[in-house]
Curated annotation (Swiss-Prot):
It comes from the Bacteria. This is Queuine tRNA-ribosyltransferase. The gene is tgt. It comes from Gluconacetobacter diazotrophicus (strain ATCC 49037 / DSM 5601 / CCUG 37298 / CIP 103539 / LMG 7603 / PAl5). The keyword Transferase applies. It is an enzyme of class 2 (transferase).
Length: 387
């Protein structure tokens, strides 16, 4: 029997929700964090190692995959799931954010965007229909609408024009979308930090009708307080039985605040990028493994983590790997950071189901504000004598 795409609520605390996202490629507990696999790979990770962190869904990118290796090639090779060895759900970004970030390399009109590849300068064209067709060729479980992402800050009239163009494009994306059991298309809510424009965008998208709704155009320099205010004004307007996705967010603290405001899905390059630059997320904040203080530290990154970096290796070894520019360092820290993000999401889900999110959130924030574990709190392991 085919699976209908749907989000089913399990529990609620205030505006925070726990539930399950049912798709053609499996069921994903929410709230969930999606590791970013832009070009068909989560950087520095095998897909087995991504699975081992507890991730249930990953993200790919239309812009990058259309340029290399090409959507039709991916289709001919069995689709993105087979190509990258990920049988679970895949959400593909539409390419809009990347194209709009090209600056002088792109030209926007009412129909779409013409741009030059950042790889070889070749000319390409993306329209709502073309973006949707590419995502279909990739066999994305969740297809995103093609939208314009204006740089902030910008005058309200500029944001309004951009949002209304994105809404017209959303209608064209919906027309081009090929419905299939267990697959979905999400509309993207725009409007900057203007509550009235966000409300107008929600009305336009719900009038078209999508399986899910994303909140775009945030985490672009507006600051956490304004981001939260925008979520407070926007999230309650989204249909309660639809999944809600906050695009490109964020830090652990951002995730917690957004979950408290009713968001279900997230993606961000932070944990993987941090791992490649020697930064490790922990319950006590962020560690920089290049710092000399770790050079002789035999302890793991965190006493609470069961990733390979923490169960098999010391801070001293990880410090050495980065000082020696060994590729294993970024691999192990990326693994650790993704494991931390998934553990963070599991903890929030469990607290929502248990009805204890308030206390759980207070505990998370209190520990993030603390210093690194002392040797008394996390003693070094006993080392065998050197023969």
């Amino acid at each position: 029997m085919s699976t209908a795409f749907r989000w089913v609520e399990q529990a609620r605390v205030g505006r925070a929700r726990a539930g399950h996202l049912h798709t053609a490629h499996g069921v994903v507990p929410t709230p969930t964090f999606m590791p970013v696999g832009t070009v068909g790979t989560v950087k520095a990770m095998t897909m087995d190692s991504v699975r081992s962190t507890g991730a249930g869904i990953v993200l790919g990118n239309t812009y990058h995959l259309m340029l290399r290796p090409g959507a039709e090639k991916v289709r001919a090779l069995g689709g993105l799931h087979r190509f990258m060895d990920w049988p679970g759900p895949i959400l593909t970004d539409s390419g809009g954010f990347q194209v709009m970030s090209l600056g002088a390399l792109r030209k926007l009109d009412q129909d779409g965007v013409t741009f030059n590849s950042h790889i070889d300068g070749s000319k390409h064209r993306l329209t709502p229909e073309r973006s949707t067709d590419i995502q279909h060729a990739l066999d994305a479980t969740i297809t995103m609408c093609f939208d314009e992402c204006p740089a902030l800050p910008a005058p309200p009239e500029t944001i309004a024009q951009s949002m209304r163009l994105s809404m017209r494009w959303a209608a064209r994306c919906r027309e081009a979308f090929v419905p299939r059991a267990g697959y979905a298309q999400y509309g993207i809510i725009q409007g900057g930090t203007e509550p009235e424009l966000r409300a107008e965008s929600v009305r336009a998208l719900t009038g078209i009708g999508f399986e899910g709704y994303a909140i775009g155009g945030l985490a672009v320099g507006e600051g956490q307080e304004l981001m939260y205010a925008t979520l407070d004004a926007t999230v309650p307007l989204i249909p309660h039985d639809s999944p809600r996705y906050l695009m490109g967010v964020g830090t652990p603290d951002d995730l917690l605040g957004a979950v408290e405001r009713g968001v279900d899905m997230f993606d961000c390059v932070m944990p993987t990028r941090a791992g490649r630059t020697a930064r490790a997320y922990t319950e006590r904040g962020t560690l920089n493994l290049r710092n000399a203080r770790h050079a002789d530290d035999t302890r793991p990154l965190s006493p609470h983590c069961d990733c390979l970096a923490c169960t098999r290796h010391s801070r001293a070894y990880l410090h050495h790997l980065f000082r020696a520019n060994e590729i294993l360092g970024p691999m192990l820290l990326t693994w650790h950071n993704l494991a931390y993000y998934q553990r963070l999401m599991r903890g929030m889900r469990g607290a929502i189901v248990a009805g204890t999110l308030g206390a759980h959130a207070a505990g998370l924030r209190a520990e993030w504000a603390m210093e690194d574990w002392t040797p008394d709190e996390m003693p070094p392991p006993d080392l065998p004598p050197v023969p």
